A protein has these predicted regions:
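Catalytic donor-sugar/metal-binding loop of nucleotide-sugar-dependent glycosyltransferases
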Residues: 119, 128-146
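Catalytic cores of eukaryotic secretory-pathway lumenal/extracellular enzymes that build
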Residues: 100, 140, 147-155
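Short aromatic/hydrophobic "clamp" motif used to bind/position activated sugar donors
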Residues: 25
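Short, glycine/acidic-enriched loop or turn micro-motifs at the edges of active sites
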Residues: 32-34, 109, 145
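Active-site acidic Asp-centered loop
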Residues: 28-30
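Long helical/loop segments within the catalytic core of UDP-sugar-dependent glycosyltransferases
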Residues: 1-22, 36-121, 132, 153-154
Length: 155
């Protein structure tokens, strides 16, 4: 990462974008465990899609969801978001507020939008809204990425 005052994830993503060469850019967090065939599903869904579809959002889940009360609460929130809210927004044709991981986007669309907003801590949701505003579409990917839920009790 080059030196500078702004030290955010979106700035790091923009920096890495300059080194990318593929047509599809994927964003996964270091602790993520995507399904083994997730990249194949991404390639297939993009290959069969309308050209206006430029972004796919995978489902997130936790591999330690049943560890304690707190992890179950996190799992319940993710289940509501990824199985109810996002599919509902997609069916209604609304903009999808993207998540910061398990997200895949056509490089050309990202370049046209000038990348991520380096000053925005909700750069992922912002990107989904900016894509929608320009007439481009996001869709849900039928694939799961697991991560670890915070397991520390409240007290």
């Amino acid at each position: 990462m080059p030196k500078g005052r702004v030290k955010t994830k979106p700035r790091a993503l923009n920096f890495a974008l300059g080194f990318s060469r593929g047509d599809i850019i994927g964003v996964l967090d270091a602790e993520d465990a995507p399904e083994k065939d997730q990249l194949l599903k991404v390639a297939n869904q993009f290959a069969l899609a309308d050209p206006r579809l430029v972004c796919l959002q995978g489902r997130l889940d936790f591999y330690n969801a049943h560890r304690n009360w707190l992890t179950r609460c996190f799992a319940l929130e993710y289940a509501a978001w990824f199985h109810v809210m996002l599919p509902g927004l997609a069916r209604l044709g609304f903009a999808l507020p993207l998540g910061g991981t398990s997200m895949y986007i056509r490089r050309s669309a990202l370049i046209d939008l000038k990348g991520w907003d380096a000053f925005n801590v909700t750069e992922d949701a912002d990107l989904g809204l900016r894509l929608s505003r320009t007439g481009l579409r996001c869709a849900l990917l039928d694939s799961k990425t697991c991560e670890e839920a915070t397991k520390m009790p409240l007290m």
